[in-house]
Amino acid sequence: MDSRRRPSKPLLTSSGEVLHRKQASPVTDEDQIHRSPKASDALPLPLYLTNAVFFTLFFSVAYYLLHRWRDKIRNSTPLHVVTLSEIAAIVSLIASFIYLLGFFGIDFVQSFIARASHEAWDLDDATPDFLVDDSGCPPPCPIVRTPNLDRQVLATLSSEEDEEIINSVVQGKVPSYSLESKIGDCKRAAAIRREALQRTTRRSLQGLPLEGFDYESILGQCCEMPVGYVQIPVGIAGPLMLDGFEYSVPMATTEGCLIASTNRGCKAIHLSGGASSVLLRDGMTRAPVVRFSSAKRASELKFFLEDPENFDTLSMVFNRSSRFARLQGIQCAIAGKNVYVRFTCSTGDAMGMNMVSKGVQNVLDFLQTDFHDMDVIGISGNFCSDKKPAAVNWIEGRGKSVVCEAVINEEVVKKVLKTNIDALVELNMLKNLAGSAIAGALGGFNAHASNIVSAIFIATGQDPAQNIESSHCITMMEAINNGKDLHVSVTMPSIEVGTVGGGTQLASQSACLNLLGVKGSNKDSPGANSRLLATIVAGSVLAGELSLMSAIAAGQLVKSHMKYNRSSKDMSKVAC
């Protein structure tokens, strides 16, 4: 058995004082009388005699049964025919075996448990120890505990070992970001980091949930240094009738009236026969920036990349990055001696930023063969353009480019939307078109497309930051059939969504994708699930635009928000 022990360390109080351990004193007869009872005291014989009896019984009955087994084989007697004495011997053998296994087996298992607990502290001798320093010096600053401690964290952190790690994190001896790798338990690491943060900041995190989340699922993928998770309510709008199918659309939001308004738009579309959608483009982009010694040399690269005869070779090099990546086009822009190369490729059911970046890196490495003087400044030169409002996305598109339209009956406009067609058409022209132009909007020719896009993105595990370009939308309204019907459409050139990777693998977001029927990758037609999700986003935006514009035209916007978007709590009583 491994008998190594951790060195004794001085215990510290919360104020940094050292608590000295008492030295062991000899055991007297009085101590033996008042000692705690042991489990072996319940045996009728002393422990060593009990062990001797069972050892003797085990080997004697084993010898007897083996002798009887040999006699039966010689006499051709069936082995299953047993006498009363043989039955007693079998029972004695089993009983003695169980006793010996229980007595010696527990000690054997405990030896491995003790060894594992000791070796866990010896994994990396080069890193700072979790234990408090032997010097007994007080920490550089006193640890002040907040009176309002988080009860759920205290319930999780119950061992002295956790307390030692917390003190090490607070004192800066152990980096907070390394807790997962050192401890090996993501939930425990989050609880320790959370408690250390509360002690450092002297602020309570009570109200931020810790329990009920799989912290293993976000390790190395979604979030670093977690201390909990934020709860956002998820509501359902719909059913949305789109391309002949009904969809219940999950929306995660804290804005009252948003889901109710979108739901009203879905109802108006459903009563009018549904909406239809068209996918115009499907291609993610990445644009590195490279530099040459002269503008002439930079133009040579531009001509080489845009030459159709070179596309097949470049495509073959690019597509090595993934079995789903397929290069669609290359667009170059020059600024002096710098070249911005915008690659566009399909990415299957993934949103595709990592996939296209790997393909771009393959092409850059390939180009170094013929362009030795090419200096790669960055894998992204903002000509992509990611997470920023940009004209290139508005004009050329990025991700999925979708158009969604519907024809709303005049009766539905009056009864459900509580307005009329002429008022909607006029408001759309003056607000969404002329008003946005006066404001100098870039892709913002709509009422509130980003509201719906953000809510669906959060619910389905998309990148919320890509709401910027994904919300590019122009809303059009026109009276048709002699003014009896309303034609409404939304054109969204850069919806960036995926159904695999990133936050889509989290349990809650995965459930919302499953509700829409687009969970995971489509095995039969790669990319079909992400394309369907993009059309659902556009259809939901269409419903939201229709309802909000109707509320504004009817003068109901302020009234509805006062009813659904105001808290009834007295905010003056909420503690800071």
Curated annotation (Swiss-Prot):
Location of region: Disordered: 1-35
Known tissue expression: Expressed in trichomes, leaves, flowers, roots and stems.
Topological type in the membrane: Multi-pass membrane protein
Stored CDD domains: HMG-CoA_reductase_classI (cd00643)
Glycosylation (residues): 319, 565
UniProt subcellular location: Endoplasmic reticulum membrane; Plastid, Chloroplast membrane; Peroxisome membrane
Catalytic activity: (R)-mevalonate + 2 NADP(+) + CoA = (3S)-3-hydroxy-3-methylglutaryl-CoA + 2 NADPH + 2 H(+)
UniProt xrefs under Gene3D superfamilies: 3-hydroxy-3-methylglutaryl-coenzyme A Reductase, Chain A, domain 2 (3.90.770.10), HMGR, N-terminal domain (1.10.3270.10), Hydroxymethylglutaryl-CoA reductase, class I/II, NAD/NADP-binding domain (3.30.70.420)
GO process terms (BP): coenzyme A metabolic process; isoprenoid biosynthetic process; sterol biosynthetic process
Residues at the catalytic site: 255, 387, 463, 561
Protein family according to the UniProt entry: Belongs to the HMG-CoA reductase family.
Stored NCBIfam families: HMG_CoA_R_NADP
Protein name: 3-hydroxy-3-methylglutaryl coenzyme A reductase 1
Protein source organism: Cannabis sativa
Phylogenetic placement of the source organism: Eukaryota, Viridiplantae, Streptophyta, Embryophyta, Tracheophyta
